[in-house]
Amino acid sequence: MTYNAKFPDGFLWGASTSAYQVEGGAQDDGKGLSQQDILNEEMALKRGVANASVASDHYHQYKEDIKLFKELGMNCYRFSIAWSRVLPKGRGEVNKQGLQFYHDLIDELLANGIEPIVTLYHYDLPWSLVEEYDGWISRKVVKDFEEYATLIIHEFKDKVKYWTTINEQSIIVQYWTQKCYIKEKYLNQNQLRYQINHHMNLAHAIACNLVHDVVKDGMVGSAIGYSPIYPLSSKPEDVLAMQNAHDLRNAYYLDVYFKGIYTKSAMQYLKDNDLAPIIEDGDMELIKSGESDFLALNYYASECAKAAPLDAMRRWSGVNWSGEKGAIDGFETQPGYYQMCKNPLVDTNDWDWAIDPIGMQYMLKDIYTRYNKPLMITENGLGAYDVLTKDKQIHDTYRIDYMHSHIAAIKKAIDLGVEVLAYSPWSAMDLLSTSNGYAKRYGFIYIDRDEKDPKVCKRYKKDSFYWYQQVIETNGEKL
């Protein structure tokens, strides 16, 4: 097939970050602690990686960063608001300095022709709510999220058109101890993974309704960590396992956002295995009311599934902590349902994530066919070891190759009729990796710091910066 599509006029080209990974200023100007401040401090002590106290110092250097964004050619920037910066205790008294920071940030973006795409929640629940009632485990968090979302959406309703609600609920289920602070007494209560997700679905619906009620011409959706799933082989058992994995790892979330239901096959599996969330009267009506206008997709890699025996041991997704290929510490297994596994037909990066640009095209076409809603790419990128040379250059041709192939795949999906609104990859600048500190870098802009010493976080443009600049300048014609 010959592909002739062009990116549409008005296509949004940008890049993404999240508050705790990039801002720093973890307790500056009245900000309260978040669970990520605590989790990253524990990770720093355990594994010797950086914590979130300084991160990439965006809080103090945002004006310089936005100048670089404008030079890059970005016309959108996806970022998150730190709940504990504006409501240090999670509710109640508003921190006016924290709120003003986001006004200043958004005003600076708009003055430079950059459309803000605001994420309300990116893993960083106020620590006080964890201390008070165990955070997202408790249904109480839904009311506090509503107070927070109401504040932010009303505050920025005249400045922000595009909103995403909660980042990567599917990833939170798999990696809950990295994305939430889970007390030791709960670690074996795996039903709580899906209870947390249910509470987030209620919060998502509330935020969707707020945007629709408050923001003129506003658009809102969730940002999902999404991996299309292939069967390991054409054996019927593996194909069925792939279908099961899709139902529980993907459809279970998307059906909520666009149909207001839990995927029946996945929910039946959860019920049969004592993993299903407790659903109260009125919950599904609320979820049904909060329909998304678009879906924001965070795509890094495809995944692979095979049949799992009934007597297999249940486990959740593994992590490669070292950055040495092949060092991943396991794959999710749901007994009798599916087992995730390595795909022998695709290459991986140093952290064992599959490099699969065709998966991008497949994902976009599949989701658009199923749900017929506009799509955004709000994360996509290559985590890698970057080297700052003596003459202050960063020659990241591997990142250029990765992004070239993935943008080309988006263009092919558009040629097949898929409506894609934006490409906002991960990440605008190097930032704190949740698992790997500053060893694993994603940015177009290099942050000169290491795990122990943040130095002054001086910024340097990578080779990929100049390449992406040309991509944006030509609206994706020059890749």
Where are these regions (language model features)?
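Active-site region of glycoside hydrolase catalytic domains
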Residues: T2-K46, K89-R91, L99-L479
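A common structural microfeature
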Residues: G10-L12, Y59, C76
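Aromatic- and Gly/Pro-rich amphipathic surface segment
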Residues: G32-K67
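Catalytic domains of carbohydrate-active enzymes, especially glycoside hydrolases
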Residues: Q61-A82, G290-F294
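Glycine-rich, proline-tolerant flexible connector loops at the mouths of alpha/beta enzymes
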Residues: I81-V94
